[in-house]
Amino acid sequence: MKKKTILIVVGIILLVPNLPVINKYVAHRTDEGYFRYANLDGSFIATQRFSFKSPGFSTVGFEEFIKNTSPAKENRKLYRLYKINPLCFWRWNNYLQIGVHFDYMDPKVIEQNMLAKGLDIKGIRQDIDSL
């Protein structure tokens, strides 16, 4: 009986923060600005927003960027700038729906590429320091 109760409580603790509306609220309060994406040279950077007026994350903006700027082949891939931490169970919903579709790239590599290209690194520098 105790095992069953413990399993139910643990299941609820893991499941509830990943329910759609609750997950968006938890992510807005704890992870706003954490989920960042960029191409290799840093000419495109996107941050996933979680306010209730924000739409879900989409690559449409990146596709438009590619269509309008025609970057080099290596800069046509979007990378996530955050590591997937399985202990952060409240992020599992985001990890499984979005994060697993993008390869990880260290933000410092993006920063170096931005410096080499002469781009402003102020925004990404703040993100690297906060990681």
Residues of each region from the PLM?
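N-terminal export/targeting and maturation segments
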Residues: 3-80
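Extracytosolic and intramembrane catalytic regions of membrane-associated proteins
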Residues: 46-131
